[in-house]
Amino acid sequence: MLLYPSVDDLLAQVDSRYSLIMLASKRAHELDAGSKPLLTDYKSPKTIGRALEEIAAGALMIDPDEKDLDA
């Protein structure tokens, strides 16, 4: 169960659960690949938790003009 950040906090930043999952997943993969963190302090030791913390903090957003090349 997700306690922090709360789903309500996350959905305040991203308009749908699907978009939230896609954004968090892509960011977690970037962090696994060695991308620089966007926050100075994280509560979660896992990359998916860190990605969700970045979204909740407003440090990470979806670019509506970006085309998904993986599709």
Curated annotation (Swiss-Prot):
Pfam families: RNA_pol_Rpb6. It catalyses: RNA(n) + a ribonucleoside 5'-triphosphate = RNA(n+1) + diphosphate. It comes from the Bacteria. GO terms for cellular component: DNA-directed RNA polymerase complex. Gene3D superfamilies: 3.90.940.10. Keywords: DNA-directed RNA polymerase, Nucleotidyltransferase, Transcription, Transferase. Its EC number is 2.7.7.6. SUPFAM superfamilies: RPB6/omega subunit-like. It is an enzyme of class 2 (transferase). GO terms for biological process: DNA-templated transcription. InterPro entries: DNA-dir_RNA_pol_omega, Pol_omega/Rpo6/RPB6, RPB6/omega-like_sf. One of its GO terms (molecular function) is DNA binding. Promotes RNA polymerase assembly. Latches the N- and C-terminal regions of the beta' subunit thereby facilitating its interaction with the beta and alpha subunits. The RNAP catalytic core consists of 2 alpha, 1 beta, 1 beta' and 1 omega subunit. When a sigma factor is associated with the core the holoenzyme is formed, which can initiate transcription. Belongs to the RNA polymerase subunit omega family. This is DNA-directed RNA polymerase subunit omega. It comes from Levilactobacillus brevis (strain ATCC 367 / BCRC 12310 / CIP 105137 / JCM 1170 / LMG 11437 / NCIMB 947 / NCTC 947). The lineage of its organism: Bacteria, Bacillati, Bacillota, Bacilli, Lactobacillales.
